[in-house]
Curated annotation (Swiss-Prot):
The keyword Transcription applies. This is ATP-dependent RNA helicase DDX1. GO terms for cellular component: cleavage body; cytoplasm; cytoplasmic stress granule; cytosol; mitochondrion; nucleus; ribonucleoprotein complex; tRNA-splicing ligase complex. Gene3D superfamilies: 2.60.120.920, P-loop containing nucleotide triphosphate hydrolases. InterPro entries: B30.2/SPRY (IPR001870), B30.2/SPRY_sf (IPR043136), ConA-like_dom_sf (IPR013320), DEAD/DEAH_box_helicase_dom (IPR011545), Helicase_ATP-bd (IPR014001), Helicase_C-like (IPR001650), P-loop_NTPase (IPR027417), RNA_helicase_DEAD_Q_motif (IPR014014). ATP binds at A46, E47, T48, G49, S50, G51, K52, T53. Residues 1-295, 525-740 are annotated as: Necessary for interaction with HNRNPK. The gene is DDX1. It catalyses: ATP + H2O = ADP + phosphate + H(+). It is an enzyme of class 3 (hydrolase). GO terms for molecular function: ATP binding; ATP hydrolysis activity; chromatin binding; DNA binding; DNA/RNA helicase activity; double-stranded RNA binding; exonuclease activity; nuclease activity. Its EC number is 3.6.4.13. Found in a multi-helicase-TICAM1 complex at least composed of DHX36, DDX1, DDX21 and TICAM1; this complex exists in resting cells with or without poly(I:C) RNA ligand stimulation. Interacts with DHX36. Interacts (via B30.2/SPRY domain) with DDX21 (via N-terminus); this interaction serves as bridges to TICAM1. Interacts with FAM98A (via N- and C-terminus). Interacts with PHF5A (via C-terminus). Interacts with MBNL1. Interacts with CSTF2. Interacts with HNRNPK. Interacts with ATM. Interacts with RELA (via C-terminus). Component of the tRNA-splicing ligase complex. Interacts with PQBP1.
């Protein structure tokens, strides 16, 4: 409890955490919880099972509670960026007059846009009608920018209409889409001075104190309009100085800092943010936090964690809601009407409720994207952007929207692009590093070679049903065609899966198949062996987990596997991401995953908490023709076996190439075993019982001691000799000194 309390976690949550036997925070929790409690946006990556859910759930629960408590007591809270009309009382960049990807720091002066393809601009909170005025801009990086002045009528893309005057880093001045050479280029570490003499109608600029001369004469139609400091950025960061701090290059010739301008010269921005700030009025269907998960299983798991963490929170109590498909919408709407504070959901149903106005996003303070790489892979980037655009960037109590992104692969291009677009100066917490296999996991490859193992020819019809990719092909023995070898691979993989279970006497395993039809076929084959969903305790008792199974069945199947009612969970990669299954002794990859990162996710199911685990991958030595649906039905009722490039829904799958990519990714060579699937005993570990902890001190400890014992004894003798020699050398000079 004390460990979590030291990070600022409230006692009620710390008590609940202690009851869960979380004595110390994990690394990801220790790094992320203080950052989120401090109000920052966080990008986090850590291994599955490292406590990522707790890392974002605990601070989200606490801040939502504190927000509700403040509202209950009538407090408005402290603000980092002032809101409403009060924001206009200070010279700063205006959070209510900016582009969608333009971020403003809490001081209102540091600005950033990380959109690499589009320009995003912003204007200040105040403008000027009279006098000679000056402000400075410092460039913090090498991105593109234009700075200058514009009226309230001007586009935020400074210099592209007749109401704005800009000076860009490429050495061009711009007005009304006319770009002319002016001054010189500027970039990182340069300071640009922006001069405005309204009385004479002149605009000019300086670079690092060097006057670049007259840039623009203000046309007559603009002389009665206030001019506001403005900028536009493309993947750049700037910091403004309106005179509150000492200028690097103070102006001359009577120009004064904007912050020193007389009140009679100043005009406040019309964009006060009143329409964009969340209303204090209570809206039952407007949650304070929204957590988006890629699958219903992860959503349910996260909701259960939230229920545990908030166990002792009272007055006010927090109300949570799970919004997922497959559940009657009227039940969810009923809960929404009664009020909700935290929503956890999957994109499909969330999109439905948001688009119909049933779920109001106007009071969201936290947006959490869990397994963001999975969400993007499933094609939900547009949904995320639409949702983010509907959430106010600043709430009524002056708090900024916090965005938290969790991802297995933070450094992927898509995740980086998303973070640049929707996050505000995020802190990266990457404890995952390069993918690696824990030393508690043995992983081996079983080559499936239909040319050397002719078992498939002798089985007749007593084999696993295949996926009908070759329903129209001649796959009879003797055809010697790629289609024949492909069909043979499918048959052999069913046999090898059964053989692996028997050889290792597996009592629990997760079996990964590539497609939903492969899962169904393997389940049917296990039923032919006497097992199946209803055969509790049977050697081949199993359940399926994939998207085509009904929601209640998926939930029930997962629970039955966790409780040990069945031995095998046959699933697609939906179960590889974050589902809370610990200590599974075995994993079988019937087919290698399309993406090399998913290999680590899959085998990460075993070997947790010092328990030994074995992952067996069945890898075809020949290409296998598999389904790859690009049709609108996503495979339902589709029998188009032509190749994708010919307008069909199949591809040739090269597992040997995938294996090579996985080995390169992990920087190791994965051991191969014979088709009998006998795994050789490790030299140090000796006989291993998968699913159980290593012997005390680690399985390899005793073997190492025996080997190193003679060397240690020799080192001890040498150390004794060296110490004795040192003492003699120190003693003799003293004796000689005394003699004289």
């Amino acid at each position: 409890m004390a460990a979590f309390s030291e990070m600022g976690v409230m006692p009620e949550i710390a008590q609940a955490v202690e009851e869960m036997d979380w004595l110390l925070p994990t690394d990801i929790q220790a790094e992320s919880i203080p950052l989120i409690l401090g109000g920052g946006d966080v990008l986090m990556a850590a291994e599955t099972g490292s406590g990522k859910t707790g890392a974002f759930s605990i601070p989200v629960i606490q801040i939502v509670y504190e927000t509700l408590k403040d509202q209950q007591e009538g407090k408005k809270g402290k603000t980092t960026i002032k809101t409403g009309a009060s924001v206009l009382n200070k010279w700063q960049m205006n959070p209510y007059d900016r582009g969608s990807a333009f971020a403003i720091g809490s001081d209102g002066l540091c600005c950033q846009s990380r959109e690499v393809k589009e320009w995003h601009g912003c204007r200040a909170t105040k403008g000027l009608m009279k006098g000679k005025h000056y402000y400075e801009v410092s460039c913090h990086d090498q991105g593109l920018c234009r700075v200058g002045w514009s009226t309230m009528q001007a586009s935020l893309d400074l210099g592209t209409d007749k109401f704005g005057f800009g000076f860009g880093g490429t050495g061009k001045k711009s007005h009304n889409k006319q770009f002319d050479n002016y001054g010189e280029e500027f970039t990182m570490h340069d300071t640009i001075g922006c001069y405005l003499d309204i009385d004479k109608g002149h605009v000019k600029f300086s670079k690092n104190g060097k006057d670049l001369g007259l840039a623009f004469e203000i046309p007559p139609h603009m002389k009665n309009q206030a001019l506001f400091p403005a900028c536009v950025l493309k993947n750049a960061e700037l910091k403004f100085n309106f005179g509150e701090e000492e200028f690097k290059f103070p102006p001359k010739d009577g120009f004064v800092a904007l912050s020193k301008a007389p009140d009679g010269y100043i005009v406040k921005s019309q964009h006060s943010g009143n329409a964009q700030v969340t209303q204090t009025k209570f809206l039952p269907n407007a949650p304070k936090a929204l957590i988006v998960e890629p699958s219903r299983e992860l959503a349910e798991q996260t909701l259960n964690n939230i229920k545990q963490f908030k166990k002792y929170i009272d007055n006010p109590k927090l109300r949570e809601l799970l919004i997922i498909g497959g559940v009657a919408a009227r039940d969810q709407l009923s809960v929404l009407e009664n009020g909700v504070d935290i929503v956890v959901g999957t994109p499909g149903r969330l999109d439905d409720l948001v688009s119909t106005g049933k779920l109001n996003l106007s009071q969201v303070r936290f947006l959490v994207l869990d397994e963001a790489d999975g969400l993007l892979t499933q094609g939900y980037s547009d949904f995320i952007n639409r949702m983010h655009n509907q959430i106010p960037q600043v709430t009524s109590d002056g708090k900024r929207l916090q965005v938290i992104v969790c991802s297995a692969t933070l450094h992927s291009f898509d995740v980086k692009k998303l973070s640049e677009k929707i996050m505000h100066f995020p802190t990266w917490v990457d404890l995952k590093g390069e993918d690696s296999v824990p030393d508690t996991v043995h992983h081996v490859v079983v080559p499936v070679n239909p040319k050397t193992d002719r078992l498939w020819e002798r089985l007749g019809k007593n084999h696993i049903r295949t996926d009908d990719v070759h329903a129209k092909d001649n796959t009879r023995p003797g055809a010697n065609s790629p289609e024949m070898w492909s069909e043979a691979i499918k048959i052999l993989k069913g046999e090898y899966a059964v053989r692996a279970i028997k050889e290792h006497k597996m009592d629990q395993a997760i079996i990964f198949c590539r497609t939903k039809i492969d899962c169904d076929n393997l389940e049917q084959y296990f039923m032919q062996q006497g097992g199946g969903p209803d055969k509790k305790g049977h050697q081949f008792s199993c359940v399926c987990l994939h998207g085509d199974r009904k929601p209640h069945e998926r939930k029930q199947n997962l629970e039955r596997f966790k409780k040990g009612d069945v031995r095998f969970l046959i699933c697609t990669d939906v179960a590889a991401r974050g589902i809370d299954i610990h200590g599974v002794p075995y994993v079988i990859n019937v087919t290698l995953p399309d993406e090399k990162q998913n290999y680590v996710h899959r085998i990460g199911r075993v070997g947790r908490a010092e328990r030994m685990g074995l992952a067996i991958s069945l890898v075809a030595t020949e290409k296998e023709k598999v389904w790859y649906h690009v049709c609108s039905s996503r495979g339902k009722g589709c029998y188009n076996t032509r190749l994708k490039e010919d307008g069909g829904c199949t591809i040739w799958y090269n597992e040997m190439q995938l294996l090579s990519e996985i080995e390169e990714h992990l920087n190791c060579t994965i051991s191969q075993v014979e088709p009998d699937i006998k795994v050789p005993v490790d030299e140090f570990d000796g006989k291993v019982t998968y699913g159980q902890k290593r012997a005390a001190g680690g399985g390899s400890y005793k073997g190492h001691v025996d080997i190193l014992a003679p060397t240690v004894q020799e080192l001890a003798a040498l150390e004794k000799e060296a110490q004795t020699s040192f003492l003699h050398l120190g003693y003799l000079p003293n004796q000689l000194f005394r003699t004289f």
